[in-house]
Amino acid sequence: MRHLRFLPQEIISSETGIEILEFVVNTLMGDDPEPPVQPFDPPTLHDLYDLEVDGPEDPNEGAVNGFFTDSMLLAADEGLDINPPPETLVTPGVVVESGRGGKKLPDLGAAEMDLRCYEEGFPPSDDEDGETEQSIHTAVNEGVKAASDVFKLDCPELPGHGCKSCEFHRNNTGMKELLCSLCYMRMHCHFIYSPVSDDESPSPDSTTSPPEIQAPAPANVCKPIPVKPKPGKRPAVDKLEDLLEGGDGPLDLSTRKLPRQ
């Protein structure tokens, strides 16, 4: 009962004791009493920030604002020390002091600021300056020349040599072995458009089906003799010509079998 230590040395009434016991029990059991309901919510900082106060006009407001400049008001808010302007020292008894000291606020009057940089770096050497200007002139000339040149398709006698279109592509890409499309096709046409035979012109004789045999076959050509197949195995042969000589039995193209041991 540490709460009773702060009570005066008087007799406690029954009602006060009951209230104290209920408070102790609720505190120990974790059942805190609900906070009292407030009739209205207190204003927040956002409400106070946008709050507009309409008060009576002060006839001395203009004189006070003219006496204390903006720099002095800012110095008072920031706790800085500022030298008062000469006109504020005319009134006796007014002294602008700062108990914090050590800091001074710069003059907040209007001033023109020059943001131009007047510093100069190291001057370039004569060699570097000349090389840079020369490279710039060369690049400009090449760009003007490339823009002024118009692409023209050329067909020289030898593909890839003396061709204006090939030179145009070589200058733009930097590849000396580049060819234009026409020179490439003329140079490699035999790989793509090579004829199948010497004469591909259609003739009325070649279109007939089946074709007619005009020239007789030579007499010394060995022709195979058709043989009716018979049952049984054909004898093995040593060479292909033996098959063309014919025979009583059918041809045997099987290999010879070795006798079993």
Swiss-Prot record:
The keyword Disulfide bond does not apply. A motif (PXLXP motif, interaction with host ZMYND11) lies at residues 106-110. A motif (PXDLS motif, CTBP-binding) lies at residues 250-254. GO terms for molecular function: zinc ion binding. Its main location: host cell. A motif (Nuclear localization signal) lies at residues 256-261. The keyword Cytoplasm does not apply. Pfam families: Adeno_E1A. A zinc finger (unnamed) spans 163-183. InterPro entries: Aden_E1A. It is found in: Host nucleus. Residues 43-51 are annotated as: Interaction with RB1 in competition with E2F1. Residues 203-212 have a biased composition (Low complexity). Transmembrane segments: none annotated. Residues 197-261 are annotated as: Disordered. Residues 78-149 are annotated as: Interaction with UBE2I. GO terms for cellular component: host cell nucleus. Coiled coil: none annotated. Changing G62E: In strain: Grider. A motif (LXCXE motif, interaction with host RB1 and TMEM173/STING) lies at residues 115-119. Keywords: Activator, Early protein, G1/S host cell cycle checkpoint dysregulation by virus, Host nucleus, Host-virus interaction, Inhibition of host innate immune response by virus, Inhibition of host interferon signaling pathway by virus, Inhibition of host STAT1 by virus, Interferon antiviral system evasion, Metal-binding, Modulation of host cell cycle by virus, Modulation of host E3 ubiquitin ligases by virus, Modulation of host ubiquitin pathway by virus, Oncogene, Transcription, Transcription regulation, Viral immunoevasion, Zinc, Zinc-finger. Interacts with host UBE2I; this interaction interferes with polySUMOylation. Interacts with host RB1; this interaction induces the aberrant dissociation of RB1-E2F1 complex thereby disrupting the activity of RB1 and activating E2F1-regulated genes. Interacts with host ATF7; the interaction enhances ATF7-mediated viral transactivation activity which requires the zinc binding domains of both proteins. Belongs to the adenoviridae E1A protein family. Plays a role in viral genome replication by driving entry of quiescent cells into the cell cycle. Stimulation of progression from G1 to S phase allows the virus to efficiently use the cellular DNA replicating machinery to achieve viral genome replication. E1A protein has both transforming and trans-activating activities. Induces the disassembly of the E2F1 transcription factor from RB1 by direct competition for the same binding site on RB1, with subsequent transcriptional activation of E2F1-regulated S-phase genes and of the E2 region of the adenoviral genome. This is Early E1A protein. It comes from Human adenovirus B serotype 7.
